[in-house]
Design a protein with these regions (language model features):
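Short loop/turn segments immediately following beta-strands, especially the blade-tip
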Residues: 114, 167-170
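Extracellular/lumenal carbohydrate-interaction signature centered on repeated Trp-anchored short motifs
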Residues: 61-71, 139-147, 154, 189
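Glycine-aromatic-enriched beta-strand/loop faces of beta-sandwich-type recognition domains
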Residues: 97-147, 201-204
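Localized edge beta-strand/strand-to-loop motifs within extracellular or lumenal beta-rich domains
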Residues: 144-168
């Protein structure tokens, strides 16, 4: 497994091979850090040993697990112009000891999920243990004039707040999307620390309809625990 250092943290890049979501072909060479310390994620069209073309995706995860706090991703790229089959995920995802797939997950995603038109982004919270609840996600439309955006997850024991803002910033100015999920049931909010992940992939493994490769740059990731710390549910 390939590892790299980005924004002061060690990240493991998913090993090359086939698997979900998708399924897709994952390529550990599709993540790199440039001299300015920015992370590059690529979706590439590759000719394999048999002479056939195939699409390669990328995913990476922090070696550390993070708890309640403020998660911020500063992105460079036209996330509003993705092909309908392209997905960018900025998210928290459980390790097997925390819970199975479909639990303990918080997502910011930019995708149309194969649709030619309609919303192109969503925020989602998967429960700790209960079945998914109505209102645990929201879709919205991103329309940019430039390529710089900031996206945040504010995770507390009783609620999750997500924000998206124009530009790279640490304040709340130029916010274009805000969502707060406070279900009133502790089972509907993740409670345990998990790694942070980012991935760039293809919905159902379907190649981009426009045939174009994609590169997204993450200029910075930051985490700040809440002060004072937010207590978990008993």
């Amino acid at each position: 497994m390939t590892s790299l250092k980005f924004s002061g943290y060690d990240w493991d890049v998913r090993a090359s091979g086939v698997g979900g979501p998708g399924p897709n072909i994952w390529d550990e060479t599709n993540a790199s850090v440039d001299r300015a310390g920015r992370l590059h994620l690529q979706l590439t069209n590759v000719t394999n040993a048999a002479g056939d073309t195939e699409w390669h995706c990328v995913e990476l995860a922090t070696q550390l697990r993070f708890g309640f706090g403020r998660y911020q991703f500063q992105v460079i790229g036209r996330i509003d112009q993705f092909d309908p089959n392209v997905v960018l995920g900025l998210f928290k995802y459980p390790t097997p000891d925390v819970g199975p797939d479909g639990t303990n997950e918080i997502d910011i995603e930019f995708a149309r999920w194969g649709r030619a038109t309609g919303n192109n982004a969503d925020y989602v919270v998967f429960p700790q243990s209960a079945p998914r609840a109505q209102g645990d996600n929201v879709e919205f439309m991103v329309a940019l004039k430039g390529s710089y955006t900031t996206h945040r997850i504010l995770w507390q024991s009783t609620q999750v707040t997500c924000q998206s803002l124009y530009g790279h910033r640490d304040d709340d100015n130029n916010q274009f999307e805000f969502w707060q999920y406070a279900p009133g049931d502790p089972r509907l909010i993740p409670q345990l620390p998990t790694p942070v992940r980012m991935n760039l992939w293809l919905f159902r493994g379907t190649p981009p309809s426009n045939g174009e490769e994609v590169e997204i740059v993450i200029s910075q990731f930051s985490f700040a625990p809440f002060d004072p710390p937010v207590d978990s549910y008993a």
